[in-house]
Amino acid sequence: MPGEELMGNRRKVIVVEGTPRTSKKQFARLLARELNYHFVGEPVPDSGILKSFYRGGDRYTLATELYFLVSRFKQLGQAMEQDLFSPSDTVLSFMIEKSRIYASMTLSDEEQKIYDSIYPMLSTTGVKPDLIVYLYAEPSIILRAVRNSPITGEEFMTREYLDSLIEAYHSFFYRYTACPVVFFDVSEIPGWNGENQDVAKDMIRFIDRLKPGSNFYVPRLAAP
């Protein structure tokens, strides 16, 4: 496959993560197709859960965060189980650690203690990324996407919440040392929807030249 030929330093597990409305799933699926990798998408949440979460109902916060944690744990567990019988290189559109990012922003101190007592049992999935591609965008662009095409529950997302979430994501990935992290500001791509094949091919070339730690990707695309 063309993508495989480009990526000489083969990485078995690639994770595409990021802030809301950055087309993580679409770009992860495209990278998987270009590399001839297996694709594992994040589980689709229940719309009622999302609505309760973004409305800010405190009584649902802990239950919501545990729901997401368990859902992601199950999805990764199923992916690992399949890989035991037919090992394959994989691109995932999420990582279990994102659960803790969200929880740290929304839970009270007492709820955080309960969450922290459960998290270690559900965060050891055996999935160890060889590379993380972190997608992010300007808050105004994310909120515009929410207004133009709202997903149930997201209409209750505030600018203050989004600013804090992006800051938490940035902080987490700047400090991440288990594998290289590629920072990609998708605001740089007009009309970004995660399905730009030229960007995917250019990203694969960039991945081939990564250094340890944080790497900052700026697409180098041919003029139309």
PLM features per residue range, with description:
Residues 16:
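Hydrophobic anchor at the beta1->P-loop junction of P-loop NTPases
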Residues 19:
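P-loop (Walker A) phosphate-binding loop of NTP-binding proteins
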Residues 23:
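Conserved glycine(s) of the Walker
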Residues 27, 31:
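Hydrophobic positions on the alpha1 helix immediately C-terminal to the Walker A/P-loop
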Residues 33-71:
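Conserved substrate/cofactor phosphate-moiety recognition/catalytic segment
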Residues 60, 64-127:
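Glycine-rich phosphate-binding loop used to anchor ATP phosphates in small-molecule kinases
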Residues 99-167:
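A glycine- and Lys/Arg-enriched "phosphate-lid" helix/loop adjacent to the NTP-binding pocket
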Residues 147-156, 160-224:
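NTP-dependent small-molecule kinase module
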